[in-house]
């Protein structure tokens, strides 16, 4: 059987702020931000989920939030070079921190990085057009 990623979990300090960011990114996130667990399916079937720190600590009493740096790095294919630039502009224009402005990477992609409300790296990319 081929290995297939099916679930990505994000532990968040502020569910509402995190969901607002990912909605702006383009995820079809349900409107219920007062629950300790929220999830949505991406177009490829991968489940993207959020859990509050309180919920994680109830499930794992020994859980300690990581300190320093980001906890997870995510990369979302934007489809086109222009979409990378537009998504970066939309997110940074809404006040989210841009870590790396859009640039043409030597591996053949347009690439940019924005931080989500929990400080996680969210990369935006698309293949460079020939």
Regions found by a protein language model. Give the residues of each.
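Core segments of cupin and vicinal oxygen chelate
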Residues: 2, 9-57
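A cross-family glycoside hydrolase active-site/sugar-binding cleft signature
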Residues: 9, 51, 75-77, 101, ...
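A generic structural signal for short beta-strands and their flanking turns/coil linkers
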Residues: 36, 46, 68-72, 96
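Short, flexible coil/turn micro-motifs enriched in small/turn-prone residues
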Residues: 1-4, 103
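Vicinal oxygen chelate
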Residues: 4-13, 39-42, 62-130
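Hydrophobic pocket/interface hotspot
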Residues: 18, 22, 84, 91
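Short, basic, helix/turn surface patches
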Residues: 57-68, 125-130
